[in-house]
Structures are given as structure tokens and as C-alpha cells.
């Protein structure tokens, strides 16, 4: 296997089919590489960059890279992994969310070598007859091979007809673009294979499918998602970005190195070995935080974020021997006053509320000002009450 293929396989989950990818790379012909993103929220996060980084690798090798904004599919709602019908977005919501994407993706991709497209360009031109012909190219039985659809069907949960259209339209995007390679999350494998199937039907060479692992959020359990509050946005301020990375568990840190870092694999393996032999993983986490912040904000901002982080922790004199407590967060969030009381940091919730109003409670070194604040799942936090009471907590769903 040549060095280019080895580089492209780093961090991938699955390639269908590897021998096809090798032949196309070895042909020397520039390939059309497609990655699609539905504008379900206005901000991209580090989970999205797992795909963007792979797209950038192809871009650096001279291939044509297409960042496809699924403005049409966004109005259907991706049913992947859902046990209920997802609320479709309105046209206004889709347009508003998509506005920020181009600015954000250029923190990773080269603007001059990136083709940004919208799938409404061809889907809006499709007639009712065209759509029916497209629907005729797949069967209900094949759709029910999808794990999420199968579970909902077996459990008597409703599946709307428009949800069956989603994988067909995503697959048709590959036909419209004549994609050679499509990148997607591991949970998108079914949809990407529909693209291969449709390309064959339309007389095209089927695309190679490359799936990437799903990045866990700050809680280390669920997929990184803005709706779950467990995300690190690529537009987050440097201090916030660095602080969030420093809040993740040591185990999750290695996962982030695997999927987000550009550090040489040999170095990461050495750091992992040293930590297993007693080295402090905090130092390795600092390296990760510095690398990520520098990528999106520059070296100066990364240094400043580290200085600010260390100053906050030095001034707060957080004990080194704090034992991490795992706290389950109820639906709707954990009211901070209740949480502080439940951690035995105050004698009552009313005392906690009084201390918040007096500025006597800090979270991760920042003074808490909102007594109605609710903590959501995701990450590890230090809660400080007064000068001497501390708790280290990891919030899970």
C-alpha cells in the first residue's frame, strides 16, 4: 500500500471499496470528492471537522473537493439514528443556518480550491414525475434494512414517506455531481451506499464510500451535537475552546487525538505509553488544546488561552487530589442551586442561591451570575464555593 493511501486511511472507519480507491488514486486523474452537510444549526463543531479534515487531505493531493450544503434535504430532516420523525426545517431556517457555513469551513479548507454547492440547485428543478421515477429505483424492503427504520417498524413507531425519500435524494446528489468518492459519518453508510446504487442505475461508475468515526461530545458518550450541549464549536472563542478541551476525560482525550489531531502517530503512541507509565496526562491534554486552538485562531491566541487557563486555576488554587464525581443530568438540565446543594457544598438550595447572588460560586474559574442557570450534560467541571470548597464533576445524560 503506497504512502498516499496510508495517509488517506488514517482515522477512517470503513472504505467501500479500497481496491477501487487505490486504482483511482494510482490513475493520476483528479477525483471529485464530495461531503454533504445539512444546515441543521448555524455553527459547525469539531465533530464536523472529522469530515472536513479528510476533505482537506484530498484537496492537498490535488483532487476536486465539493462541500455540499444540503439545503433541500435539510427541509426533509435526516432520519438517521432517530426513533421518531425529525422535525423538518423551514426554508428560512435552512438559509439562515447556511449563511455561516462558508466562513467557517475556510478555517479548514482552501477557499480557492473548494467548490461549495447546494443540492436545491438540481432538486428544485426536479418535477413530480422525476421524483416518482427516482422513488421507483429503490424498494421499501431495502429501506427497512436500515437499522433505525427496522427498529421503528418493528416497534410500531410511525415512519413518514418523506423519510424514505431522504436517502434517495442524498444518493441522487452523487449522481448529479458525478462523485468519485463520498465522505460521510459511519452512521451515514446506508445513505452513501444508496448513492453507489443509484450511480450504477444511471450508468455512472459507482463512487467509493469512505466513512469516518463519529466523534463523541464532551460527555464522552453521545455524538457531539449542539442540541445536546456537548460540543466544541469551531467559532468558539479561544479561551472557551481551550477550556472545553481541558475538561474532557483522559480516555476521551486519546479519542480526540485519533480523530482531530495532526500530530505524528508515533508521537501520540509515545505520549500514551508515557502516561500509562505514570506521566501526567494533563500535559498531553494541553498539547491537544494548543493544537486545536492554534488551528482555528492562530498561535498567539493559543498561547494566550493557555496563559489565561493557568492563571484562573492558579488563582483559584484548585486541589490536585479532587475525586471526579459522575452526575446524571435530568431532562431539562440540572438547576445549579440544587446541584451545589446535592454536592454538599452548601447547607441548602437557598444558601446556594444567596451565594450566587453574592458572587460566591464559580464554575471552571468563572463567577456564576445567573441563579436560574441549569447545567447540561457534557464535559468535566470544577465548581468552587467560597475560597475552600471544591467539587470536580462529570455530567452525563
From Swiss-Prot:
Cross-referenced Pfam families: tRNA-synt_1b
Residues engaged in binding ATP: 226
PROSITE patterns xref list: AA_TRNA_LIGASE_I (PS00178), S4 (PS50889)
GO cellular component: cytosol
Alphabetized UniProt keyword annotations: Aminoacyl-tRNA synthetase, ATP-binding, Cytoplasm, Ligase, Nucleotide-binding, Protein biosynthesis, RNA-binding
An annotated GO BP: tyrosyl-tRNA aminoacylation
E.C. no: 6.1.1.1
Record localization: Cytoplasm
Span of the annotated motif 'KMSKS' region: 223-227
Similarity field: Belongs to the class-I aminoacyl-tRNA synthetase family. TyrS type 2 subfamily.
Protein name: Tyrosine--tRNA ligase
Organism the protein comes from: Methylococcus capsulatus (strain ATCC 33009 / NCIMB 11132 / Bath)
